[in-house]
């Protein structure tokens, strides 16, 4: 049997790490060193009407290419997620004050999460997949928001929506439409199918 290709996850996301680990994939972690905000701003300048799903895919591609160039013999898995509300693209909050602002803007509103995953080898992206989910936060009280921020802590700043749906953040929601893994940040079923096709997992 041929030796399986070494797999690298180009992400420092604990959630993505845990999803792949739970699925039985052997891999190492090498977070991509790219300036995401600079890329986002450049994309916005080039095309004000760019689709948020396309932004997620382009960022996932950039991460995959960056790590693959430094690890040409490995199979790289990279991902990105964007959040859009009425045409506005959100970034991860820098602190709890920004997290509060994000949640107040999303409160009672329907928004979209767009999650992209890319596979790269030898410096080139060879496969991508993008999925979207539609979510709506309930019209929670300020008292609940204050309590949530206190209990959830700085960890929510790792989520573009300032919520972690797999934890306490689930209580923020009124409606969720979409794949659970996509919402967490990695479309697992399409990714696992592609890894099996490539021989990185047993078919």
Describe these PLM feature segments.
Residues 2-7, 46-203:
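Anionic-ligand binding patches
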Residues 15, 35-37, 125:
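Surface-exposed, flexible loop/turn segments at secondary-structure boundaries
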Residues 2-25:
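N-terminal beta1-alpha1 ligand-phosphate binding loop
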Residues 12, 32, 122:
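Cofactor-binding loop segments of dinucleotide-utilizing enzymes, especially the Rossmann-like FAD-
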């Amino acid at each position: 049997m041929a030796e399986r290709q070494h797999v690298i996850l180009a992400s420092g996301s604990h959630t993505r790490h845990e999803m792949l680990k739970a699925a039985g994939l052997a891999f190492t972690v090498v977070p991509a060193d790219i300036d995401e905000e600079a890329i986002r701003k450049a994309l916005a300048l080039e095309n004000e009407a760019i689709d948020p799903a396309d932004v997620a895919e382009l960022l996932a591609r950039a991460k995959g290419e960056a790590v693959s160039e430094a690890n040409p013999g490995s199979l790289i898995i990279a991902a990105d997620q964007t959040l859009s509300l009425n045409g506005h693209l959100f970034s991860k909050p820098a602190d709890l004050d920004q997290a509060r602002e994000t949640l107040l803007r999303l409160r009672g509103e329907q928004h979209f999460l767009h999650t992209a995953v890319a596979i790269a080898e030898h410096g080139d992206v060879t496969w991508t997949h993008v999925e979207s989910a539609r979510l709506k936060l309930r019209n929670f009280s300020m008292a609940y928001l204050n309590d949530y921020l206190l209990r959830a802590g700085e960890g929510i700043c790792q989520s573009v929506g300032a919520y972690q749906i797999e934890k306490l953040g689930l209580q923020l929601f009124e409606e969720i439409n979409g794949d659970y893994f996509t919402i967490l940040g990695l479309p697992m079923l399409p990714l696992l199918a592609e890894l099996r096709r490539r021989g990185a997992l047993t078919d």
